[in-house]
């Protein structure tokens, strides 16, 4: 059963007919009144063409969505049973009718030389008093320069200067025998030297500085450098840079070695995926108060993670940058432009996101079909399995659907480390004969690369990280915003999914052994962060729509709303805001502090 426009434009009908292809199926085809008659000559099966009565022609998904958003009755537009299902599960709230097309960001990292005129102009803006001396120092040291540019005009927003050193070059570059000896004793391999971070003062200074630091650090990690040191160029030092480096885990070297240097061990970094902004629906996701709350929460979590393994690198990876670079690689692999063409020109491959990345979006000029997978825990957290996301077809059927497109698949995910999702999908892909052209991920670890070689897949990551100590996905730490699904026979109403966040008071942290006080502090940080973000969302929602953002309407603000599982006998009041429940959880968590001392009032 299809519309006449599908027969006219869908690529499956434009392919040559073959055994078991869609051309041999019997068809019921609906044609709108007044539409140009379509050519059904490609269909060898029986064709029955129908047109709808005029009163039904007025019914459209657009009208239904508008009525749902306005909380109006839709019984005259849709079957009452379907209406009840839509309202019970809070479907279509603030949802676009069509999947949004993923767009490339306008940020670009460009290496350049110290004599580049763009660098000189930037230094005069960010350090006007010492610009010339800095240029002279860069000329003497020969450090590499990385520019952060914006837009087609490549406006320079910031720059980082660095040098990758072997042990025999430490003294010649650092100019201090004590500092060279300190690095040689602690590095255990090649060393990255950060000599400068130049970003003009602005509200975005910290964000742009973080992007530059991440780019330089991941560049060094990909080359298997094991240690990093910050020693500013002569005559250049800035307090905000030291604060940014502190959030990456850098610590001061002993005072007898150097008064200005900071250092960090990069052998087993702690990875933090900065993705909360991708879980919030527009227009709330771009509201200044929400953006500020998300940014403040991220920096607070970064600070907290530096206490887990003092002196080890805490690497923050921006989901926005990963999206941008994955888009470039997907379209390049598919041989199509990065910007949607008109008319659309599809490449030969199909993009298949199989994790939490790129859900509900379309890659430009590329057939995009998401494999809806979910990590589902047993109620006691004793085990979990990779299954189909609730209300979606079983994984076997989803894979067969992918195979039916008869296109080589580009599998996409945010991370490939232990590979639990791809291990679950691999037998299904092989059983159906689905061709996997490439596996593209946000970051690929050494363990993940070994797994892909053993399975015979060609895998590539935006970032390559040989080792990691721990990895955190920020959204999964935030109650009501993210988490992992809990298996329950009955789901809560309001479109909420029972879930668990692996922090107190919902569960014991799953990360490598933490002392009780650190585990408690990390948990408090995460729950308070979620509360602050939800408060900002509730305030902005009230301002924009003149009503409260309650649990029953949380799906208007959060793409995949979840609720912390409290057991089968506990139910949420859907008329309350999510932040009020987190206030209660924070109070409960404060009762659980280890070694808490009572005070007399």
What spans do the regions from the language model cover?
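Classical nucleotidyltransferase
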Residues: 1-107
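Short, charged/polar "capping" segments at the starts of alpha-helices
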Residues: 9-10, 34-40, 235-241, 358-363, ...
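Short amphipathic alpha-helix that is part of the acyltransferase structural core
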Residues: 102-136, 140-141, 145-151, 155-157
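Conserved acyl-donor/pantetheine-binding loop and adjacent beta-alpha core of acyl/acetyltransferases
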Residues: 155-157, 161-196
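Conserved acetyl-CoA-binding loop-helix of GNAT-fold acetyltransferases
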Residues: 175-179, 191-199, 204-222, 418-427
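PRPP-associated nucleotide enzymes
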Residues: 246, 252-601
């Amino acid at each position: 059963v299809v519309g006449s426009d599908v027969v006219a434009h869908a690529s499956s009908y434009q392919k040559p007919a073959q055994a078991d292809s869609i051309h041999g199926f019997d068809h019921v085809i609906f044609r709108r009144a007044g539409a140009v008659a379509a050519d059904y000559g490609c269909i060898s099966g029986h064709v029955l063409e129908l047109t709808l009565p005029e009163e039904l022609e007025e019914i459209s998904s657009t009208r239904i969505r508008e009525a749902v958003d306005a909380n109006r009755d839709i019984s005259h537009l849709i079957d009452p049973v379907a209406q009840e299902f839509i309202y019970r599960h809070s479907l279509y709230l603030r949802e676009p009718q069509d999947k949004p097309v993923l767009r490339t960001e306008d940020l670009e990292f460009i290496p350049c030389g110290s004599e580049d005129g763009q660098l000189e102009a930037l230094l005069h803006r960010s350090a006007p008093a010492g610009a010339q001396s800095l240029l002279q120092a860069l000329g003497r040291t020969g450090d590499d320069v990385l520019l952060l540019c914006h837009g087609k005009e490549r406006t320079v927003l910031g720059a980082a200067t660095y040098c990758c050193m072997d042990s025999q070059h430490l003294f010649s570059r650092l100019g201090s025998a004590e500092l060279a000896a300190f690095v040689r004793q602690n590095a255990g391999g090649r060393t990255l030297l950060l000599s400068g971070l130049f970003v003009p003062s602005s509200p975005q200074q910290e964000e742009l500085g973080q992007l530059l630091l991440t780019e330089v650090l991941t560049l060094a990690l990909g080359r298997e450098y094991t240690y990093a040191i910050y020693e500013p160029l002569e005559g250049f030092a800035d307090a905000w840079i030291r604060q940014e480096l502190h959030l990456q885990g850098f610590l001061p070297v002993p005072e007898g070695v150097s008064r200005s240097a900071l250092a960090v061990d990069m052998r087993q970094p702690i990875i933090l995926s900065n993705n909360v902004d991708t879980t919030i629906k527009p227009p709330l996701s771009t509201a200044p108060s929400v953006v500020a709350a998300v940014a403040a929460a991220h920096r607070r979590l970064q600070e907290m993670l530096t206490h887990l393994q003092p002196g080890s690198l805490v690497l923050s990876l921006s989901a926005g940058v990963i999206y941008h670079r994955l888009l470039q690689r997907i379209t390049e692999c598919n041989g199509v432009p990065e910007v949607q063409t008109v008319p659309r020109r599809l490449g030969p491959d199909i993009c298949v996101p199989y994790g939490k990345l790129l859900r509900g979006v379309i890659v430009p000029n590329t057939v995009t079909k998401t494999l809806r997978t979910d990590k589902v825990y047993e109620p006691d957290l004793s085990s979990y399995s990779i299954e189909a996301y609730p209300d979606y077809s079983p994984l076997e059927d989803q894979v067969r659907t992918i195979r039916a497109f008869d296109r080589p698949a580009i599998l996409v995910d945010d991370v490939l480390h232990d590979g639990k999702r791809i291990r679950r999908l691999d037998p299904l892909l092989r059983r159906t004969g689905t061709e996997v052209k490439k596996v593209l991920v946000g970051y690929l670890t050494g363990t993940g690369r070994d797994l892909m070689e053993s399975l015979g897949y060609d895998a590539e990551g935006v970032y390559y990280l040989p080792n990691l100590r721990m990895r955190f996905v920020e959204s999964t730490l935030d109650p009501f915003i993210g988490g992992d699904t809990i298996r329950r026979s009955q789901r809560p109403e309001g479109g909420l999914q029972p879930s668990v966040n692996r922090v107190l008071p919902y569960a014991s942290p799953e990360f490598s052994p933490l002392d009780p006080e650190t585990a408690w502090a990390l948990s408090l940080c995460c729950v308070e962060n979620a509360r602050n973000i939800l408060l900002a969302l509730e305030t902005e929602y009230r301002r924009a729509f003149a009503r409260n953002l309650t649990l029953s309407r949380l799906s208007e603000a959060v793409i995949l709303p979840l609720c912390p599982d409290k057991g089968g006998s506990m139910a949420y009041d859907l008329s309350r805001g999510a932040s009020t429940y987190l206030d209660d959880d924070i109070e409960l968590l404060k009762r659980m502090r280890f070694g808490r001392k009572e005070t007399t009032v």
